[in-house]
Swiss-Prot record:
Subcellular location as annotated: Nucleus
Residues carrying Phosphoserine: 12, 28
Gene Ontology MF annotations: nuclear receptor activity; RNA polymerase II cis-regulatory region sequence-specific DNA binding; thyroid hormone binding; zinc ion binding
Gene giving rise to this polypeptide: THRA
Binding-site residues for Zn(2+) 1, renumbered to this chain: 51, 54, 68, 71
Organism: Aptenodytes patagonicus (King penguin)
PANTHER family according to UniProt: NUCLEAR HORMONE RECEPTOR, THYROID HORMONE RECEPTOR ALPHA
Region (Modulating): 1-50
Zinc finger (NR C4-type): 51-71, 89-113
Region (Disordered): 1-22
The protein, known as: Thyroid hormone receptor alpha
Family designation: Belongs to the nuclear hormone receptor family. NR1 subfamily.
Domain remark in the UniProt entry: Composed of three domains: a modulating N-terminal domain, a DNA-binding domain and a C-terminal ligand-binding domain.
Length: 402
């Protein structure tokens, strides 16, 4: 430390004391220089700009002055804890403050902070600091919402051609979807005693209630026929070779039937309505032959209920499932892929038009395609067991074909 001439002779101090002071200064200097090498430096600072208090490398504009992190923290703690009345100086307040000596005299360092213009009134107490942080977070959230709304406003709506395609697909769905929007009024609940007493043993440990299975097979043929009719009403589908049409229908039939059942999930009665007419509970569908597939369809129904899909969205999702170019054995793979892309683009633009409140609605909805694919795969495995355990005469021919 530098000080005014004094009657005290520094050489009169014990040698050990002088050695310890020097060692402490060197160690302090090394730590401070090391800490100043890292950290974010704002773009408004000149290269190697110095702290106006101690001369160390400045990190920004703090309490109305350009200072380093060390002097910023020292000033803040001093004011927040009201420490300055307790500070004292051994050398009559005449210490020179630099990055090596700054930690050795708190009073002179604080006086230097004040003399260069650091503002005490800008230091916030704990409650004000918490309030400021909260305000910053609220502003960030507000800006994020504004940006999201702005991005939604700039997302394209369907073009005139896409609206025409959307209309065709929607009408195809409505004309082939049993009971339409009146399914709740027209549904009939499967009697509770059916599907509660499994009889035929299955190889995987589950059992099949043959009475429930028989009830389900009565509605399966009309349900499959309606899926076929839906596909035939789509102009792009009818332009494909018959071989490809058959492959696409076999591939998507279970997926579309599962989707049509899932969107008719009723949380109040905890039922799915099959083919627009038969309301069944989870255990009934499970014991009626579907086993774990029943859980997957019910779970899908629960999750889709939050999406509040309209007829058009269900119809377009069905068209996307139908036009899947990765089905094995297809001839016109490229043409089918382009058809699906056309449906997907129109679908995405329609989602933009609808302006759902669910964050990331579009990608979340597309994930349901994967869920439906998994349901189909599980059903295919389950179907092999059913063919072994259930009487052949109970299977409708069309069901066996798809």
């Amino acid at each position: 430390m530098e000080q005014k001439p004094s009657t005290l002779d520094p050489l009169s101090e014990p040698e050990d004391t002088r050695w310890l002071d020097g060692k402490r200064k060197r160690k302090s200097s090394q730590c401070l220089v090391k800490s100043s090498m890292s950290g974010y430096i704002p773009s408004y600072l000149d290269k190697d700009e110095q702290c106006v208090v101690c001369g160390d490398k400045a990190t920004g504009y703090h309490y109305r002055c350009i200072t380093c992190e060390g002097c910023k923290g020292f000033f803040r703690r001093t004011i927040q804890k009201n420490l300055h009345p307790t500070y004292s100086c051994k050398y009559d307040g005449c210490c020179v403050i630099d990055k090596i000596t700054r930690n050795q005299c708190q009073l002179c360092r604080f006086k230097k902070c004040i003399s260069v213009g650091m503002a005490m009134d800008l230091v916030l107490d704990d409650s004000k600091r918490v309030a400021k942080r909260k305000l910053i977070e609220e502003n960030r959230e507000r800006r994020r919402k504004e940006e999201m709304i702005k991005s939604l406003q700039h997302r394209p709506n369907p073009s005139a051609e896409e609206w025409e395609l959307i209309h065709v697909v929607t009408e195809a769905h409505r004309s082939t979807n049993a009971q339409g929007s009146h399914w709740k009024q027209k549904r009939k609940f499967l009697p509770e005693d059916i599907g509660q007493s499994p009889m035929a043993s299955m190889p995987d440990g589950d059992k099949v209630d043959l009475e429930a299975f028989s009830e389900f097979t009565k509605i399966i043929t009309p349900a499959i026929t309606r899926v076929v009719d839906f596909a035939k009403k789509l102009p792009m589908f009818s332009e494909l070779p018959c071989e490809d049409q058959i492959i696409l229908l076999k591939g998507c039939c279970m997926e579309i039937m599962s989707l049509r059942a899932a969107v008719r999930y009723d949380p109040e009665s905890e039922t799915l309505t099959l083919s627009g007419e038969m309301a069944v509970k989870r255990e009934q569908l499970k014991n009626g032959g579907l086993g774990v597939v029943s859980d997957a369809i019910f779970d899908l129904g629960k999750s889709l209920s939050a999406f509040n899909l309209d007829d058009t969205e269900v119809a377009l999702l069905q068209a996307v499932l139908l036009m899947s170019s990765d089905r094995t054995g297809l001839i016109c793979v490229e043409k089918i892929e382009k058809c699906q892309e056309t449906y997907l683009l129109a679908f995405e633009h329609y989602i933009n038009y609808r302006k759902h409140n669910i964050p990331h609605f579009w990608p979340k909805l597309l994930m349901k395609v994967t869920d439906l694919r998994m349901i189909r795969a599980c059903h295919a495995s389950r179907f092999l067991h059913m063919k072994v355990e259930c009487p052949t005469e109970l299977f409708p021919p069309l069901f066996l074909e798809v």
